[in-house]
Structure formats: C-alpha cells, structure tokens
C-alpha cells in the first residue's frame, strides 16, 4: 500500500487534543477546537436516539459487510476476462488503493468532525453547491448498488423456488425486505444483524467454493465430450470487456466513502483506522482466495452470478444460506443513502434525534422512496454486473479516487511547491486523481456499450421481465 502520509493530516498535541485543521470550511459548520466545542452531527446524552454507540469491532463488521457482498458473485467472471494474474493484480492493487484512500477520508473526518458524509467533505473545497452535487451523487450511487443487490436477491429467490413466480414479484419482495432492514435507525443496531449477515454470506460462498472443486465440469460447460476450460494466467479481452471487468473488481473494495457516516456513530472515532485496516485486509484476502479457486475450476464457463456454476443443488444450498447476508448487506447501502438524506433534511433541528412524528415520517418516507427507486432501476437493467459497473464508473470512482485525492491535495497544497519529497507525495495524489477520471470515463463508456449490446442481442429482453434470471450463463 502507499506511504502512510494520510496519517499526517491529523496531528495531536501532547494532551491528545486535536489541533485545528487548515481547510477552508466553506458553508459547512466549523469546529472551534480552542473552545472545546464540537459540531458532531449526533450528540451524546440526549433525550431521544443515542446514535454514538458503535464500537470499533462492530464498525469493522459493518465495513466488512459493506465491501464483501455482491461483488464475490461477479469477480470470478472478471477473472475469466482478465486471467488469473491480471485479475489477482487488480484485486490486490485496488484493495490497497481503496484502503489508502479510505484512511485519507477517515483522517479528514477526524480533522473536521462536522462532516457526516463525503458530501460535507467536498463542501470544504467547493462550498454549498459542491456539497449538494456530491450529495445527489451519493443517492445515485447507493441506488444503483442497491438495485444490483435487488437483482442478486431475486436470483436467489428464483433459484430456491425453481422460478416459483414472476421475477418482478420477487424483485418487489426483495426491495421491501431491503427497505425493512435499511429502516433500522442506528449502525449500532445494524451491527448485530450485520454479524449474522456477514457470517451467513461467507458460509454460503464457502459452500459454493468447496462444491465447485468437487464437480467434474462446470454446470455451464458442455456436459459430454472434451471441452476447453479456458483458464489462462493472462487473458486478452477487448477494451470494453476488460474495462467492465476491471470496474467490477474496483467496486468490490471501494466502499470507504460509506464508512464516513459510521465514524459519526462510533464511540471512539479515533479507532476508525484500526477498523478500516482490519476490514481491508480480510476483505482483500477473501476476494483473492475465493475468486482464484472459482476461476481455477470454472475457467470461462461461469454462470452469472457464480453460484449457478456448481449445479442446481449447490446453487440452492448456497443461496439458501447466503440470502440473509445478501439482504442485510444490500440494506446497509440503502441505509447509508437514507441516513445522508435524513441528516440533510433534519440537521441542527430537534427532530434529528427526538422521537417525533417529523423524525419518523422523514426517516421512513426516505427509506420507502429509495427502496422504490432501487426496485425500478433493478427491473430496468436486470443484470448485476452492469449495475455494479455503472455505479463504479460514474459514482464510486470519484468517491474512492478523485475526491480523496482532491481533499489530500487541498489539505497539503503547500506540498506542490515544497521539498522534493513533498512534491513526490503531491504528484502521487495527482496520479490517483487522474486515474480516477480514467476509470470514470472509460468505465462508463464500456458499461453503456455492453448494456446496449445486451438489449440488442436479447440478453436483456425487456424491462420488468418475469422470466427466470437465475440461470444466465457467461462463457463460450
């Protein structure tokens, strides 16, 4: 991972008190450290909802579930396009880079406790309009990822029931289940359920990974005669296919912008770095090991999502075990968007933490609206890889690469003309920003091209389609 220069954003005096930062606060309420006043979004010891109750261990589990989720169902197909070496380097590289930028965001949050989301942070640079623009981007990103989750859950329902009813009906049930979980108000309470979700999802994935090593050939491969597994250390995909595959790997660990609201609810926000590093290491190791095993035994004969590759029985078992984890994991993404909008509407009012009608009406109304939007998007583009790729390109590349680099450069603007070492550090973050722009533009173009091809070829036959979506095969 890159050099730990992000840690220098936050400096402590001998008493452990945080020194005042150098950022221009713009329209975001400032912090007067000298007077001991803070502008934390959620206050402690209030007559109402206590939000700041999350331990670093529980935060770690939330971070794990944010990042280790639907992507494990899409990454093996990405390795099929990139090869084992190319895919492995992408997983290691993106995990390291996303952890590093996550540490930058955490340090900015510690230096500016009034920031509840990435939108508030960008308001430090761009003012009110920048904050609102990034806020809209957060809603779009979380809606796209939630929609991808709804698609994954409908696949699970179809697999378990042998397509027992119209897929649109399963989509509606999925959106309702996700919204019910998302409507739990605090990350602390979500944390207990997240433990269950994370464990069940990992067990489901592990069952599938073991099962796929025991079959003679992948379910999608020809069932008689010789066939070419298609495994390769290095593959040579087209630019469009390669970019979508790279974007799907990138999105697997780029959830660090979702960590920021969790920091606002931690008992000890200074423990964030510990939680971020532990979660990043575990998630990267699981993605790398599980994906390599799946690709080794399936090659290019991968179903999308991957659970179908081991046959119908294993697919049912894996989905049956992991479905609670899928629902809970997707609910966290919607919860982050809902919490942003909720705080945006009620910030600095008595209704933010008081159990009033306005509090509950706003919270539930926002969750229902977001769940409805995710359902509509899921039925309009019902392929998981494309939804994740779209979210990664237009939203998560800025969130995890461009914006953290800009925040670092704004904090250390003097490095631009400083010593040679300082100039190198500044240039490194300029490169991160430029790479983020490349991911955003090239990724968006590639995903749009593939979505158009999917409609043209009938892979996506129509919107709000009742057809079974649990057996789509990607391969030769």
Swiss-Prot record:
<dbReference type="GO" id="GO:0015179">
    <property type="term" value="F:L-amino acid transmembrane transporter activity"/>
</dbReference>
<comment type="similarity">
    <text>Belongs to the amino acid/polyamine transporter 2 family.</text>
</comment>
<dbReference type="InterPro" id="IPR013057">
    <property type="entry name" value="AA_transpt_TM"/>
</dbReference>
<feature type="transmembrane region" description="Helical">
    <location>
        <begin position="317"/>
        <end position="337"/>
    </location>
</feature>
<protein>
    <recommendedName>
        <fullName>Transmembrane transporter FPSE_08127</fullName>
    </recommendedName>
</protein>
<feature type="transmembrane region" description="Helical">
    <location>
        <begin position="431"/>
        <end position="451"/>
    </location>
</feature>
<feature type="glycosylation site" description="N-linked (GlcNAc...) asparagine">
    <location>
        <position position="111"/>
    </location>
</feature>
<feature type="transmembrane region" description="Helical">
    <location>
        <begin position="275"/>
        <end position="295"/>
    </location>
</feature>
<keyword id="KW-0472">Membrane</keyword>
<dbReference type="GO" id="GO:0016020">
    <property type="term" value="C:membrane"/>
</dbReference>
<dbReference type="Pfam" id="PF01490">
    <property type="entry name" value="Aa_trans"/>
</dbReference>
<feature type="transmembrane region" description="Helical">
    <location>
        <begin position="192"/>
        <end position="212"/>
    </location>
</feature>
<keyword id="KW-1133">Transmembrane helix</keyword>
<keyword id="KW-0325">Glycoprotein</keyword>
<comment type="function">
    <text>Transmembrane transporter; part of the Fusarium detoxification of benzoxazolinone cluster involved in the degradation of benzoxazolinones produced by the host plant. Maize, wheat, and rye produce the 2 benzoxazinone phytoanticipins 2,4-dihy-droxy-7-methoxy-1,4-benzoxazin-3-one (DIMBOA) and 2,4-dihydroxy-1,4-benzoxazin-3-one (DIBOA) that, due to their inherent instability once released, spontaneously degrade to the more stable corresponding benzoxazolinones, 6-methoxy-2-benzoxazolinone (MBOA) and 2-benzoxazolinone (BOA), respectively.</text>
</comment>
<feature type="transmembrane region" description="Helical">
    <location>
        <begin position="164"/>
        <end position="184"/>
    </location>
</feature>
<keyword id="KW-0813">Transport</keyword>
<feature type="transmembrane region" description="Helical">
    <location>
        <begin position="364"/>
        <end position="384"/>
    </location>
</feature>
<feature type="transmembrane region" description="Helical">
    <location>
        <begin position="72"/>
        <end position="92"/>
    </location>
</feature>
<keyword id="KW-0812">Transmembrane</keyword>
<feature type="transmembrane region" description="Helical">
    <location>
        <begin position="133"/>
        <end position="153"/>
    </location>
</feature>
<feature type="transmembrane region" description="Helical">
    <location>
        <begin position="231"/>
        <end position="251"/>
    </location>
</feature>
<feature type="transmembrane region" description="Helical">
    <location>
        <begin position="387"/>
        <end position="407"/>
    </location>
</feature>
């Amino acid at each position: 991972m890159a050099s730990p220069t992000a840690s220098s954003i936050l400096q402590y005096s001998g008493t452990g008190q945080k020194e005042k930062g150098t950022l221009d606060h713009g329209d975001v309420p400032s912090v007067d450290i000298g007077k001991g006043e803070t502008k934390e979004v959620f206050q402690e010891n209030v007559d109402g909802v206590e939000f700041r109750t999350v331990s670093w261990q529980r935060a770690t589990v939330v971070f794990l579930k944010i990042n280790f989720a639907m992507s494990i169902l899409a990454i093996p197909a990405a390795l099929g396009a990139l090869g084992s070496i190319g895919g492995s380097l992408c997983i290691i590289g993106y995990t390291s880079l996303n952890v590093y930028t996550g540490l930058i965001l955490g340090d900015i949050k510690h230096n500016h406790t009034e920031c509840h989301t990435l939108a508030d942070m960008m308001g430090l640079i761009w003012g009110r309009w920048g904050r609102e623009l990034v806020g809209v981007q957060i809603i779009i990103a979380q809606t796209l990822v939630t929609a991808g989750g709804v698609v994954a859950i409908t696949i699970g329902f179809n697999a378990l029931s042998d397509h027992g009813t119209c897929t649109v009906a399963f989509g509606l049930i999925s959106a309702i289940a996700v919204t019910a979980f998302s409507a739990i108000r605090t990350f602390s309470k979500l944390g207990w359920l997240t433990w269950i979700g994370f464990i069940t999802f990992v067990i489901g994935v592990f069952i599938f990974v073991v099962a796929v090593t025991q079959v003679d050939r992948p379910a999608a491969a020809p069932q008689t005669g010789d066939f070419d597994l298609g495994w390769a250390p290095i593959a040579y995909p087209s630019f469009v296919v390669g970019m979508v595959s790279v974007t799907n790997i990138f999105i697997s660990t780029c959830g660090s912008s979702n960590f920021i609201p969790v920091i606002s609810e931690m008992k000890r926000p200074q423990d964030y770095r510990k939680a971020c590093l532990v979660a990043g290491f575990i998630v990267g190791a699981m993605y790398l090991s599980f994906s390599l095993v799946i690709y080794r035994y399936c090659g290019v004969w991968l179903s999308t999502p991957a659970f179908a590759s081991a046959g119908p029985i294993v697919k049912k078992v894996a989905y049956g075990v992991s479905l609670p984890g899928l629902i809970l994991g997707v609910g966290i993404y919607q919860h982050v968007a809902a919490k942003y909008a909720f705080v945006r509407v009620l910030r600095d009012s008595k209704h933010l933490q008081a159990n009033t009608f306005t509090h509950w009406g706003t919270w539930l109304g926002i969750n229902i609206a977001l769940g409805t939007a995710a359902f509509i998007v899921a039925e309009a583009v019902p392929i998981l890889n494309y939804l994740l790729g779209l979210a990664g390109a237009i939203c998560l590349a800025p969130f995890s690469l461009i914006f953290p680099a800009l925040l670092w450069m704004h904090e250390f603007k003097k490095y631009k003309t400083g010593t040679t070492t300082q100039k190198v550090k500044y240039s490194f973050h300029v490169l991160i920003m430029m790479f983020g722009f490349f991911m955003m533009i090239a990724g968006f173009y590639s995903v749009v091209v593939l979505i158009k091809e999917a409609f043209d070829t009938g892979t996506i036959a129509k919107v709000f389609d009742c057809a079974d979506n649990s057996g789509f095969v990607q391969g030769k």
